[in-house]
Amino acid sequence: MRVSEGENFKDLKRVVRGSRLHTVCEEARCPNIFDCWNRRTATFMILGDVCTRACRFCAVTSGRPAELDLGEPLRVAESVAELGLRHAVITSVDRDDLLDGGAGIFARTIRAIRQRSPGTTIEVLTPDFQGDFNAVRTVVEAGPDIFNHNTETVPRLYSRIRPKAVYANSLALLRHVKALAPSMVTKSGLMVGLGETEEELVEVFRNMRAHNIDVLTVGQYLRPSKKHAEVARFYRPEEFAALKVQALEMGFGHVEAGPLVRSSYHADEQVPARKSQLAG
């Protein structure tokens, strides 16, 4: 299938290249890149493009990261302003080599965007900061509209798929965000097709709601290469629809579920909808 590169896509690609920035859209080979970029939403990946972890589902390069680029927050903010983005998502590689896990750079990036593009909504998709709540506070106090941290898979599969992470820490992180900022939208995402059962997925949904998570995304895992975890099975569209119904019945304010759904999919639509619900 041939996908058309619209003018918005070309503009964003030009600015990203010219500003020496990274996007997770490209680094993680997201299937929705054309859709999102043409909607003027993008996910910038800060803290470099080399991750200190090597999760078995992720296409991002792992290894020893370079030194911090202290000019990165300003370049991201200038790019957001130049492109007139409606919604900017800021994510990062894991930086377990840094004392604050990169939280300070997240905060500087958020504030720089706010200063130059006050009408742009901002979502952060953070690592787990190794359970450091001080790092979480640093990001929350910068005031993003959405705080996203992905649970990724069910706890039984963590040792195989996400060996350096702890399921309970991911949930606790998002609960702490809500404790610090009750009106901030919290969000998490799951991949399916890694060998989980429906019962395990539903239990994760329950755990998320018990930790006051507002928005859920559920998408099909696609194997980036032969060195990554194999796909156990592909879910049918009606299975995603059923999972969405169950999640909404549990009280999630917004759910995106489908084969190509990723954590930032249609993220620009989630901020006003959920904020109005929380305000009401």
Language-model features: where?
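Small/polar loops that bind or transfer phosphate-bearing groups
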Residues: 46-47, 124, 257
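Core AdoMet radical
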Residues: 59-76, 80-133, 139-173, 187, ...
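Canonical Radical SAM [4Fe-4S] cluster-binding loop centered on the CxxxCxxC motif
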Residues: 35-72
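Auxiliary Fe-S-binding modules of radical SAM enzymes
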Residues: 1-43, 74, 78, 108-119, ...
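Conserved functional loop/turn residues at catalytic and ligand-binding sites
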Residues: 50, 54, 59, 84, ...
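Glycine/Thr-rich phosphate-binding loops of Rossmann-like dinucleotide-binding domains
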Residues: 54, 98, 157, 226, ...
